[in-house]
Regions:
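Extracytoplasmic thiol/disulfide redox context detector
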Residues: 1-84, 152-167
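Conserved short-loop catalytic and cofactor-binding motifs
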Residues: 30, 78-81, 114, 141, ...
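Short N-terminal micro-motifs specific to bacterial/archaeal maturation
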Residues: 33-36, 44, 96, 117, ...
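Solvent-exposed, flexible loop/coil residues
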Residues: 36-37, 85, 120, 174, ...
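Residues at structural and domain junctions
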Residues: 36-39, 50, 79, 91, ...
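Structural alpha/beta surface segment adjacent to cysteine/selenocysteine redox centers
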Residues: 46-48, 54-131, 136
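C-terminal cap of thioredoxin/glutaredoxin-like
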Residues: 47, 61, 127-187
Length: 187
């Protein structure tokens, strides 16, 4: 009988570690720009309402993409780190997109950031911003409606942000890591 109890405790601990690992993996899930086996990994934590994050995506990322990502030398891991309600709305919209739509939508929101983040009607402004990309209003609204999928996405965004703050020391946006090492100062 003692052997069975020990065995069950052992199995429980193994399963718990697997679940924790899956949860951690889910918390750290990122959208990837570039090839999977690129030797240089640029990890970005950004907030959709952060002006410096927008500047990086508008001014710096195109050059990095041209020199490193498009040549297979690097890949970008984008991780949301929403700092406020406005950023969370932007994150909910981008995270709702499929792989093909994600980076065009993300880039468009960063390019037009002052317009939609400072609008009286943020949701309508996001819709107008994304309309040229073919994003229809019903699709946009479905990304924000009150359902289990969106509640889980919201919780995951917050949990991922909290995990990055506590476990990786992310305390501002944008924050970058290159091959796991935090880059201080301007990227």
């Amino acid at each position: 009988m003692q052997y069975i109890k020990t065995f069950l405790i052992f199995i429980f601990l193994i399963i718990s570690k697997i679940v924790i690992a899956q949860d951690e993996e889910e918390l750290l899930s990122a959208r990837v720009l570039g090839i999977e086996n690129a030797p240089i990994i640029i990890e970005e934590y950004a907030s959709m309402s952060c002006g410096h994050c927008a500047s990086f995506h508008i001014q710096t990322l195109p050059e990095i993409k041209k020199k490193y990502i498009d040549t297979g030398r690097a890949k970008l891991l984008f991780r949301d780190f929403p700092l406020d309600r406005t950023a969370m709305l932007g994150s909910m919209v981008t995270q709702c997109m499929n792989e093909k739509q994600f980076f065009p939508v993300l880039n468009r929101l960063f390019q037009k950031q002052p317009e939609w983040t400072q609008s009286e009607d943020i949701l309508e402004s996001i819709f107008k911003t994304l309309q040229p990309l073919g994003i229809e209003k019903p699709m946009l609204l479905s990304c924000l409606e009150d359902n289990e999928t969106n509640k889980n996405r919201w919780k995951l965004l917050l949990a991922g942000r909290d995990y990055a703050a506590k476990q990786k020391g992310v305390d501002a946006t944008p924050t970058f890591f290159v091959n796991g090492k935090k880059v201080e100062g301007r990227f």
